[in-house]
């Protein structure tokens, strides 16, 4: 179908396979994905990569990529309005993926753009130049950006605010407040 409509050799047409949710089960149970197709690994919708390429997959011609969430709509609870993924967590998980071959394709699910602006900036800057960041400087990335926008003199104040915000928001996402019901797979 692709060859017919794009009029190129199938191996010259960039393609991805995203083993997300049910598709992960199919892949894990033996689905053959051609070598030139990029495997795009997904986080668990809460910032932790569910899987990265194993040594055999790292040798694939199609390499691998990541699909990362700053926003999520789905069960058991969605979070759509606030960016609560700490930059250090994003860095650790994306570098874990990058270091196992995820260098071909990075996708970020953001939902509403404006409240996710700092997370988007962190993700894009890291994707553009992974070597510019490390575990010591990634946490200051967002406060430096805000300092650049609003005045360098405020950078340390922004950092204190962001540190407190991420600590509180990560302990329990604000969108989850008021949800006291636990997820019961038998019920759903």
Positions of predicted regions on the chain:
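Active-site clefts of carbohydrate-active enzymes
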Residues: 61-87
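Flexible loop/turn segments at secondary-structure boundaries
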Residues: 22-27, 46-49, 56, 72-77, ...
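Conserved, mostly hydrophobic/aromatic
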Residues: 39, 97, 109, 145
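Gly/Pro-rich turn-and-neighbor structural signature
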Residues: 1-61, 168-181, 185-188
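C-terminal non-catalytic alpha-helical accessory regions
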Residues: 142-188
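Ser/Thr/Asn(+Pro)-rich, low-complexity disordered segments
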Residues: 1-9, 24, 135-140, 144-149
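Aromatic/acidic polysaccharide-binding cleft in carbohydrate-active enzymes
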Residues: 107-132, 176-177, 182, 186
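Catalytic-core region of carbohydrate-active enzymes that cleave or remodel glycosidic bonds
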Residues: 81-108, 122-133
């Amino acid at each position: 179908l692709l060859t017919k409509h794009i009029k190129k050799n199938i191996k010259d047409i960039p393609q991805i396979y995203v083993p997300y949710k049910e598709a992960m089960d199919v892949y894990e149970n033996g689905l053959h994905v051609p070598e030139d197709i990029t495997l795009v690994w997904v986080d668990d919708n809460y910032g932790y990569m569910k899987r990265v390429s194993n040594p055999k997959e790292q040798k694939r011609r199609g390499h691998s990529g990541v699909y990362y969430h700053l926003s999520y709509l789905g069960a058991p609870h969605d979070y759509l309005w606030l960016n609560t993924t700490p930059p250090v967590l994003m860095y650790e998980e994306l570098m874990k993926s990058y270091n196992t071959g995820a260098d071909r394709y990075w996708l970020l699910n953001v939902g509403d753009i404006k409240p996710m602006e700092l997370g988007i900036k962190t993700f894009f800057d890291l994707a553009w130049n992974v070597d510019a960041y490390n575990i010591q400087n990634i946490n200051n990335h967002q406060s430096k950006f805000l300092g650049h926008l609003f005045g360098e003199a405020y950078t340390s104040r922004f950092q204190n605010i962001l540190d407190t915000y991420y600590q509180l928001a990560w302990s329990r996402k604000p969108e989850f407040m008021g949800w006291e019901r636990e997820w019961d797979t038998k019920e759903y």
